[in-house]
């Protein structure tokens, strides 16, 4: 294999580039044009994950967020926020048929937050993923969505506009612990698949060209449940904007921006709450951190 190029991300350049991707707020747009995001996930045990993914997607600026969850989780997720559209369908026998018409309207779909490991639900999620691949729907795959790929990586090989967001352990389960073997396996993914490996220093892999873009460290020493869901949700919105803007490297730009953004959220919340920091505290930092880091000086 060709040598891997490890490219440190130049933050000033990234921030300047992403500001051109963020859509300007104008009065002649209608609801939905700034982003319609779907989240496939949510079970009785895991209701927070899909909520955090969906709420972060609209907090950063998408107009609408849909959560497609198990019926047992629906009322709980609805109680967290009236701003989310919740569909209790994942355990229905005709779940895919019910979800399909909504998929046509969505810009990006996040598969995995709070999905759980129930075989029937995993099968439904797998079929939804296949439908997304068949229709070339951009997807972000996280958490239990990555579990689906452990033995079925071919589901996404050669597909366009796919971003995986594994943590270190999920990355090793997908691609192995040996660096060379992992690069070899990733090379089969194709040019349309991007891998964002989360860690102290996030890494964004472009397997087709043997590039690894390394993000600087950031955030704090406090790790709390839900932070990865904030990343997948904000990433989905950033991805939709990058695609709509015509940016030539939409997945790379969105992945770098979301990695940087979530670490900034963590740092801002840690300043206020320290060891007591929770994911909900990070959600509350989204408006101020986004304004400081990404907002154009002239919103009009």
UniProtKB/Swiss-Prot annotation:
It is an enzyme of class 4 (lyase). ATP binds at residues 198-202, 219-228. Disulfide bonds: none annotated. It holds the Pfam family Carb_kinase. Its EC number is 4.2.1.93. The keyword NADP applies. GO terms for biological process: metabolite repair; nicotinamide nucleotide metabolic process. Its cofactor is Mg(2+). Gene3D superfamilies: 3.40.1190.20. The keyword ATP-binding applies. It catalyses: (6S)-NADHX + ATP = ADP + phosphate + NADH + H(+); (6S)-NADPHX + ATP = ADP + phosphate + NADPH + H(+). Keywords: ATP-binding, Lyase, NAD, NADP, Nucleotide-binding, Phosphoprotein. One of its GO terms (cellular component) is mitochondrion. (6S)-NADPHX binds at residues 114, 167-173, 229. Residues 14-293 form the YjeF C-terminal domain. SUPFAM superfamilies: Ribokinase-like (SSF53613). One of its GO terms (molecular function) is ATP binding. Catalyzes the dehydration of the S-form of NAD(P)HX at the expense of ATP, which is converted to ADP. Together with NAD(P)HX epimerase, which catalyzes the epimerization of the S- and R-forms, the enzyme allows the repair of both epimers of NAD(P)HX, a damaged form of NAD(P)H that is a result of enzymatic or heat-dependent hydration. NCBIfam families: yjeF_cterm. Belongs to the NnrD/CARKD family. This is ATP-dependent (S)-NAD(P)H-hydrate dehydratase. It comes from Drosophila melanogaster. The gene is Naxd.
């Amino acid at each position: 294999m060709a040598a891997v190029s490890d490219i440190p991300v130049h933050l000033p350049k990234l921030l300047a580039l992403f500001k051109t991707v963020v859509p300007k707020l104008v009065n002649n747009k209608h609801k939905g044009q700034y982003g319609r995001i779907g989240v496939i996930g949510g079970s009785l045990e895991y209701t927070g994950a899909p909520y955090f993914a969906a709420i972060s997607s609209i907090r950063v600026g998408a107009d609408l967020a849909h959560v497609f969850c198990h019926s047992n989780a629906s009322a709980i997720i609805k109680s967290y926020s009236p701003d989310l559209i919740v569909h209790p369908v994942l355990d229905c026998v005709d779940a895919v048929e019910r979800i399909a018409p909504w998929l046509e309207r969505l810009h990006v779909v996040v598969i995995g937050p709070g999905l759980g490991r129930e075989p029937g639900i995993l099968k439904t999620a797998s079929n939804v993923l296949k439908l997304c691949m068949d229709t070339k729907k951009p997807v972000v795959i996280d958490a239990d969505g990555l579990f689906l790929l452990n033995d079925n990586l071919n589901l996404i090989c050669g597909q366009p506009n796919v971003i995986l967001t594994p943590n270190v352990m999920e990355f090793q389960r997908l691609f192995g612990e040996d660096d060379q073997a992992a690069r070899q396996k990733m090379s089969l993914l194709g040019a349309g698949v991007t891998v964002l490996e989360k860690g102290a220093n996030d890494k964004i892999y472009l397997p087709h060209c043997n590039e690894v873009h390394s993000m600087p460290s950031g955030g704090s020493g406090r790790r709390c449940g839900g932070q990865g869901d904030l990343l997948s949700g904000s990433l989905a919105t950033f991805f939709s904007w990058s695609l709509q803007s015509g940016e030539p490297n939409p997945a790379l730009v969105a992945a770098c921006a979301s990695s940087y953004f979530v670490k900034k959220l963590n740092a801002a919340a840690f300043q206020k709450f320290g060891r007591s920091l929770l994911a909900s505290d990070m959600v509350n930092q989204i408006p101020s951190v986004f304004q400081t880091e990404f907002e154009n000086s002239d919103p009009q």
